[in-house]
Amino acid sequence: MLNFLFSSPADSLALRAFLAFLTALVIGLACGPALIRELKKLHFGQAVRTDGPKTHLAKDGTPTMGGALILAAITLSTLCWADLGNRFIWVVLFVTLGYGAIGWIDDYRKIVHHDPHGMSAREKFSWQSVIGLAAAFYLALALAVEPGGTFAEAIGAWYDARFPLDVTANIHLYLPLWTDWAFPLGLIGFIVFVYIVIVGSSNAVNLTDGLDGLAILPTVLVGSALGLYAYAAGNPDFAGAAYAAAAPHIPGAEELAVLAAALAGAGLAFLWFNAHPAQVFMGDVGALALGGCLGTMAVVARVELILAVMGGIFVVETLSVMIQTTYFRFSHGKRVFLMAPIHHHFELKGWQETQVVVRFWIITFILTALGLSVLALH
């Protein structure tokens, strides 16, 4: 919206990313207190599970749905400073806001019906699947578009070629540090793979969001790193050497650095109010959306496997739930962990909430640095 102030969007990318960060940060810090007051007035408080750690009972009634502020800050800042003609900006916003809408409905039902579970798992997963599959199909063809091309042209070319299942080499799977190896996924394989990445990332961040500040700082760290990878993928001077020699140049991917900067600013502003003891929770409206945002950015930059490394905390949290649920079912009631997700296990082992959070932050910082080291090595 405001990028017309710059003669060349490409040349002003770093400045626009900084302005996006600053704009989102100011929006979050300025509007946070008013939002918290309004949520309290509406009695939009979190219903706490009674089977969890007893220290969490004091959190009952804490305002939730604060993730709406994160999404508003990201969206407004991105619309102000990003190149709105960029095809990748819109697909990331589509997933982010679409998953945010699912989360908003889920949170609203929890509050109105005083039910900690909200939407049924089947209903939530169904809507996540619709958005995830739509984004996956879009990305499969959008990655085939040459610089200056349009999505409609990609659809037309695909139709003229009688719907080939391998649209472009850009939809291969690339391994970090591999010099020239790329696994061809084909159109169907790519859509399924992207669907898993987006939906999996969304649910992983949502599962992690169980303690004050636990999910938001890792999201900021990983999102910022993905912004750097997106810049590398879209820059012809770096593409192909960013993390694997076979990795493609993705024209337009660099613009996601602006959105990633907005995410970082909005996330840090939210952390100001979400730090222990939290004044507000992000709720599913924030957690589902931010996870989907991370997954989609990773797909555009073609660093899905690096996302799994940098977001290791999200992966472990998800695996702990899967292991606990599976073992409980087949062992007739026995458990591997005292409670899942695993951050509750450590609480029940005697760790203070702040110890769990800060230690998980430290692990994420190390994993993010490890993920970025691949970029530095090349």
Task: Please provide the spans of the model-predicted regions.
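Membrane interface segments of multi-pass transport proteins and intramembrane proteases
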Residues: 110-120, 177-183, 352
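Alpha-helical transmembrane segments
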Residues: 2-40, 70-103, 133-173, 190-378
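Juxtamembrane helix-loop transition segments at the membrane interface in multi-pass membrane proteins
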Residues: 42-44, 114, 285
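Membrane-interfacial loop-to-helix junctions in multi-pass inner-membrane proteins
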Residues: 85-93, 112-127
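A cross-family signal for N-terminal binding/gating loops and helix N-caps
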Residues: 40-45, 51-53, 57, 69
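Juxtamembrane helix-capping/reentrant segments at transmembrane boundaries
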Residues: 49-62, 116-128, 343
